[in-house]
Amino acid sequence: MEEENKKMDMKIEAKGTEALLEYAKTTGMQVNEDGSLPFIGFVVGKPFKGKSTMTPPRNKEDEGSYVHLSSQDVTGEEFAYPSGELDVRSNREVKHYIAQDYDVLITNRKTKGSADYRVSILRIKPGQKVVIPDNVIAIRPTCPEMSTALRDYLNLESTREQVRNLNPSPVYSITTKAIQSLKIPGEVIDK
């Protein structure tokens, strides 16, 4: 079993960022002039505490800052959004934002005594480092292109789980170690 896991990790490491970039070029996904992907978005880390109203971002000038949403604001979920990118006025708008502007979601374990997944959103910028907490249990693409890329290049099996009604794309089970071996640049904002 350990040998199989090692092979899987090696396979994913070899198929990481370069493979996703090559796939993007062949499918017409947006690619920067220097040939790099503009960003890959993750949902990562521990949940924020629920609040009755949204709180302002830490720093409006900082792309890494975010706003908090209460669990009532987004169908029982708790999210953190990068600042300056969305005026959250309705659940529909929130869902559209997640589905359209982020390529990948990573989902936390359910919290004790709660029926909801609790997640937060990260926008990855080139050259930053990805840190994946141990409580991450799944990775989920939020666009068809990334879904196909993950399936084709990482050979992941779909568990068919979904995070509420945000997007019908499958959830792919993957270990923390395997996610880290992807070596995709980025940074967790909810430390």
What are these model-derived regions, one by one?
Residues 152, 156-160:
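Polar helix-capping/helix-linker motif
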Residues 40-57, 72-101:
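Sequence-specific dsDNA recognition surfaces
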Residues 128-137, 166-191:
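A short glycine-rich beta-alpha junction/loop motif
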Residues 95-97, 101-152:
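A short beta-sheet element
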Residues 1-60, 181-191:
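Non-catalytic DNA-recognition/assembly elements of restriction-modification systems
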Residues 69:
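Flexible loop/N-cap segments at domain edges
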